[in-house]
Amino acid sequence: MNAIEIKNLTKNFGQKQALCGLNMTVPVGSIYGFIGENGSGKSTTEKILCGLIHPSSGNVKIFDKEHTNIDVRSKMGCLIEMPGCFKNYSVWNNLMLQAVNLNIQNPEEEVRKVLKLVRMEGAASNKFKNCSLGMKQRIGIAMALLGNPNLLILDEPINGLDVDGMRIMREIMIDLTTNHNCTIVVSSHVLGELEKVATHYGIIRQGKMIKEMAAEELEQSCRTYVAVKAKEINKTKGVLSCKYNKVVEDENEYIRIYDIVTPEEIVTYLYNNDILVNEVKTDKISLEEYYIDLMNEKGGK
């Protein structure tokens, strides 16, 4: 059984088709990185999963039940946008109000539990308006965790956060899936951060799923390149470009060679052209680079 199974999902807004036969499978216990450019259909899919909008057609099952099933809905938590909180209320009072509205038994105990999960026990008395962006995002996750959900839908939870905020968010997601029987679907444009936590990926383009894979498959799919660093960057790049098909300079002043070649061959070739190499290494392309390659292959950005 999977946490989510979507088949042939469509959604129309007037004449505009936002989802065009989307298929999606999210394994139980995974952190599923949901990736796509703006307007690709990510948010529409997440809103359908959360019951905020209805699909035009297709089948959506959550834990093998229809996504509209009341038992399913009670075991889901969603953070689709900045949480709607009373700005002059404390963090504690905002969460208590939500817990009472959800008819949660022992609301005080539940609020204490979710505050601990999102690393905010010490900020319970803070007014919402005085909280940082990262804290507000964590308050939203705390609200979504009320009721002990098995599935969490997070739309762009790390965008705009500083380094420490992103680290805390990563730790929270890993803790929830590892220790609290939770499956997470998380969308983000910060692919470098997503790559650090995701166990599975789904890449969507123009309302269709173009690739789903486990993190292990991504690791195997990412092509290897050789990177060299030499004193004369432009000369090095020019010499390498005369022999190899794809040679690029990265942001760290390494020259990358994507052809199938060994580091020893590169060093020897440059030495024969009077260029001494300061450093040479092999590496694999990142999730972001893989995504860009895939979009180019499919005719996207």
Question: Where do the PLM segments sit?
Answer:
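Glycine-centered loop/turn motif at secondary-structure junctions
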Residues: 103, 119, 243-244, 274
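ABC transporter nucleotide-binding domains
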Residues: 4, 11-186, 191-205, 209-211
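Surface-exposed charge patches
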Residues: 97, 113, 238, 268, ...
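Residue-level "edge-of-site" marker
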Residues: 128, 252, 283
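ABC-family P-loop ATPase nucleotide-binding domain
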Residues: 1-10, 297-301
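C-terminal coupling/interaction segments
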Residues: 258-301
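Residue-level detector of short coil/turn "hinge" positions at structural boundaries
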Residues: 106, 122, 247, 271, ...
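ABC transporter nucleotide-binding domain
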Residues: 170-258
